Amino acid sequence: MKKSLLLFVALLLSGVVAAADTRPREIAEAEQVIVRTFGRLPEQLRFVLARPDASGCDSYAVSVEEGQLCIEGTSCVALCRGFYDYILSQGYGVANWSGNRLELPDRLPDLKRRVTRSPFRHHLYMNVCTFGYTTPFWDWERWERELDWMALHGFDMPLAPVATEAILARVWRKMGLTQKEIDAYFTGPAHMPWMRMGNMTGLDGAPSQEWHEGQIALQHRILERMRALGMKPLFQGFAGFVPEGMRRLYPDLALTRTRWSGFESNLLSPLDPRFVEIGSAFVREWEREFGRGEYYLVDCFNELDVPFGEKGSDERAATLRRYAQTVYRSLSEANPGAVWMMQGWMFGYQRTIWDPHSVEALLSGVPDGKLCVIDLAVDFNDYVWRSENSWNYYSGLYGKEWIYSTVPNFGGRSALTGVLDFYANGHLGALASRNRGELVGYGTSPEGVENNEAVYEVISAAGWSSRRIDVLR
């Protein structure tokens, strides 16, 4: 009798485990986002994983019948966004950096099924500079909250450069650089974004080996969660900037000095074979540590003069094309499936340098479908530079995929500002433009976060809408 009872209990438990194992992971992860954010999973809630359509764009549907809330979504992020859209639109809750609230009535009023389809395949979040102004000293607990915030607000393509320097140091040590030479190049954590873009080196001291190891451990947790949530992280690639110590290893190295705000950096010539050697070694070492990637962010000439030939010359065009070919080779030789992501800040900010001829030359060096330009600051075109939108000025970005993005925060400032109607509806002009070209994504790239929360509620909603939003409603 005792054996029979034990066998019955074992079979019952195995059935429960088997049943749990058959649940889509997307649903389990979405439920955990809600529990972590609001402290509980509403009894009235049911998630349903839907089949995505051929467009590659996510969608969700919301309905309430007999008091039961049903959220259908094509991905984990779509499920989270669907739930958050419902509670926010009904006034039942909010999730932001100041705090979270969820207060559902005992019985939810019935709601006719409402479908929301995003017009974009990607929903980008963060800026290279966010990792200097806001996040450099975040721990896992803080990152976990931000990842949940991203999912609820519908962002599925976050930047993920944490531990870049730890991996880069490995590559350079293998090449023969001393730790002293590497440390002389590295900045402190808060200045690393500008080091990655070739703007500065050496400022504020190099981090310790213990700090690097901590960043590697942190990045493993960040990426594990991003992947569990179905996100598409943007890793860092190699833009060609190297320590001064490289001259000792390779006296014949072809280096150009670049200058930014009183700082100088060394840029490898795209004709030098060691450019691809270093870049591909970095990608291999990165993927050996963190697994396969697809999207690699490489920022070239950010707020820098182009050090190749005269503006408008064939020499400049040819060298820019060669530079792009070299960057892409440094990615593709290590990972043939890699896509180069490029922040297009300089295309709007420095049009005296980046004329259409130069931009077309740069972009033409990479096959279509293998380079995606982030049109970083569309709001600056309209309200700061008073200039033509890049998708028009550069003829649809010459056939390259691109992402519409805004910079609602500059320099980590905390002023309560923002043109809400533009953030809600500005992307509709891009979607309707005859020069929209290969517009595949929508995003926001604040230099600092944890501020101005109302703006981000509007921005995140806009990324899932192809219709005009009335911000006063």
Place the predicted regions along the sequence by residue.
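Sec-dependent N-terminal signal peptides
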Residues: S4-L13
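Short, intrinsically disordered, charge-balanced linker/junction segments flanking boundaries
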Residues: V16-A20, D470-R473
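Contiguous, structured surface segment used for ligand recognition
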Residues: A20-F120
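Catalytic-core regions of glycoside hydrolase
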Residues: P42, V94, N100-P109, M126-T130, ...
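N-terminal structural segment of carbohydrate-active enzymes
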Residues: R81-G82, F120-P161
